[in-house]
Amino acid sequence: GRVHDINSYDALSSDFMNDDLSDYLDDQFAGEYLDQYTLRTPKDRMPLYHLVGALDPLTDADVTDRPNDRLPVTLGEWINADGLTHLKIKLSGDNFDWDVDRVVAIEKLAAGAQAARGCSEWFYSLDFNEKCENVEYVLAFLKKVQEQSPAAYDRTQYIEQPTSRDLKAHPEIKLHEAAKLKPVVVDEALVDYEALLLARDQGYTGIALKACKGHSESLCLGAAAQKFGMFLCVQDLTCPGFSFLHSASLAARIPTVTAIEGNGRQYCPDPNRPYARAMPSMFDITDGTVGTSCLDDIGLGFG
């Protein structure tokens, strides 16, 4: 993009690319280029997914050490400070009762915090970090959550990598039944196009893209997911500063990505400060969204 003094996402057509997508994926993509699967202008704003870690306190009763860093500590404080509407909940995958209780507790806390600020719509994603032994665990978990908190179940947008990343070693694990209930997203197992196809065969209905795993690979796999009608999300692995802007630019240019993960501000906020001065809409969160329209400069859109 910088070579041609244009945004890199505008350099993905046959005018700039020597080979079509079939060279990187397969013959299903003959005659297609990445410009067909990306936007010419970034989305204006995107909801921000806030991480709720397994050890993160929900209320003051959970706080054992309150750092003197002027940041929110409890989930309720974060919701109030940033106007959060999207929460990514980390679960154990091997402690059934704890997993169910955690989601139910978060829904109870969030419902109070959101009601206090007049918000009626918010969402969850659930990340088991590949700890579930089988699909039966996922199915039983979803059933129990739906029984104990129908609202929490309804707010859940997708489930992320519930079982082992080693798809070839566990062909017996099929996630089709779980995917009938909620999109099931492949994350750690997504290493290339072959892995995407295998994950799809095993019941995954969505993929998670990470800019830090490779920009070109993310674009190609994002194109494949769109062609196959799969759910798409972009995650950032606690990337701060420049790396968060890169992740956001990817999310803002892929049409079917509806939210962006951004937890660097929670755990390592200092690297964000120089960039916040130049792009406040990306780092000063007040309504649960980031203003991605600013990512329209040459190159990747920033800096």
Sequence positions of predicted segments:
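N-terminal capping/lid subdomain adjacent to the active-site entrance of alpha/beta enzymes
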Residues: 1-131, 135-147, 301-303
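General beta-strand structural signal in soluble alpha/beta enzymes
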Residues: 10, 50, 126, 186, ...
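A generic structural signal for short, non-catalytic loop/turn and secondary-structure boundary residues
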Residues: 39-45, 152, 177-179, 253-255, ...
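Flexible C-terminal active-site loop/helix
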Residues: 237-303
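Residues that form or immediately flank small-molecule/cofactor binding pockets and catalytic motifs
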Residues: 53, 189, 264-265
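Short, surface-exposed amphipathic charged segments that create phosphate/polyanion-binding patches used
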Residues: 64, 140-141, 201, 222-223, ...
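Catalytic core of soluble alpha/beta enzymes
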Residues: 80, 86-238, 243-244
